[in-house]
Every structure is written in structure tokens, then in C-alpha cells.
Amino acid sequence: MKIGIIREGKIPPDARVLLTPEQCKKIEANLPVDILVEPSENRVFEDEEYEKQNVTLSKDMESCKVLMGVKEVPIMNLIPNKTYFFFSHTIKEQVYNRKLLQAILAKNIRLIDYEVLTNERGQRLIAFGRFAGMVGAHNGLWTYGKRTGSFELKRMKDHKDHAEAQAYYKEVKFPPIKIVLTGTGRVGKGAAEVLEDMGIQKVKPKDFLNQTYDHAV
């Protein structure tokens, strides 16, 4: 079976991708599957990184039985009679994607939406989690820095990976601001992880309210 990793077509373009080059190589080595990757200038991994793992690049996805992406696929890019995996944002009857769902039906496409994939206990397999919290905390502080002009911070998407972001945080000097982080679930824990990476001290609620600090807490 051939699986195609499609180029993200939604505007603005998304840099995310379903499988890393190493994951593609591992899947092909252990399963009766061939993976084709559609070239992309916007993907977080360069095309050459897939080629180095002997993963085939191809602009033609017609030969693939299954096509996998992240965001909604533009209607004009939908190939009839295929199985697609992506976040369609149609499950809650979102009006803005009604035409997309109609096109999927008209083209005899089987859509498998990540949003409704669950385990035997009915729990979602793909949902907001650690990485959503990490990106949210980072970009929240990026926004604060932009609005106040008190510090500079690159967007999370401009970092190659988490390790690069961690190294970058050591160069950033945050002003003495107070940050309230609510929630202790997967997203909250991801946000707390980034704040810790940034060197932002965690303090007790009473001290947070009553003490003055010369650094971010």
C-alpha cells in the first residue's frame, strides 16, 4: 500500500507534518507500506531530509491509496476515491467548511478525521496536549513582549525543534513580570515546562500575591 504525505495547502501555510523523515523510514522498514512525500517549501523538515532517509519525493499523489495531512485540504486539491486523514473541522457542523464536506461526499472520498479517533474507552487519541501548552505559553509571552516592547522573543515556529528553543531561552532576559498559569492537565503541564525552560521561577500563591520580585515569576 502507498501512503502519501501531502503538502499543506491551506493559507497561511502550516509547517507541521504527520511523519518525520525518521518515522517514514521506520514505517517502511517494518510494514508493507511505501510512503511518498509531496515536496513542500513550508514544511518544518526540508525535502532533502526525507531524501537522506531514502523516502521518495513525488508531486504525483494519484498512486497513493491513503493521503495524510494536518489542516483542511483545499477543495481543488482533493483527489476522488481516496482515503484522507486530516483535521476537517466539520464534526461540529462548522458552517465555514460545509462546502468542503460536500466536495468530499461528491468525490467519493473516505474521510478519517483525527478529531474523532478514540481508544476503547472513548478517549481521544489525538487532542490538545503537551505541545499545545508549550507553544501556547511561548507565543503568549511573544505577544506580551511585542505589545509592551519590554523584551524580544522569536516565535516558536521559527525554531527547528524544542532543543533549539531551550538554548535560545538562555539568551532572553525577561522583565520582572508575574504570570498566572491555570490548569494542571496536559496543556497546563506543557506550558509549565516551557516556563521552567525559560528560567521563570515558580512561587507559592501567597508569595505571588504579597511579594515583589526583580525577575519573572
How does the language model describe each region?
Residues R7-S40, E152-V217:
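Glycine-rich phosphate/diphosphate-binding loop of Rossmann-like nucleotide-binding domains
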Residues R43-V44, E120-R121, Q211:
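Short secondary-structure capping/turn micro-motifs that flank functional sites
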Residues E49-Y50, E72, I126-A127, G133, ...:
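Charge-rich, low-complexity amphipathic helices
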